[in-house]
Amino acid sequence: AYTVTLYLQG
């Protein structure tokens, strides 16, 4: 999931 990736990157 793309949005989750951005969330984990901070």
From Swiss-Prot:
Reaction(s) catalysed (UniProt annotation): Endohydrolysis of (1->6)-alpha-D-glucosidic linkages in dextran
Keyword Hydrolase: yes
pH dependence, record text: Optimum pH is 4.5.
Thermal dependence of function as given in the entry: Optimum temperature is 35 degrees Celsius.
EC number: 3.2.1.11
Molecular function (Gene Ontology), one example: dextranase activity
The keyword Hydrolase belongs to this UniProt entry's keyword annotation: yes
Class of this enzyme: hydrolase
Keywords: Carbohydrate metabolism, Glycosidase, Hydrolase, Polysaccharide degradation
Miscellaneous section: On the 2D-gel the determined pI of this protein is: 4.5, its MW is: 158 kDa.
Protein name: Dextranase
Protein's organism: Bacillus licheniformis
Source organism phylogeny: Bacteria, Bacillati, Bacillota, Bacilli, Bacillales
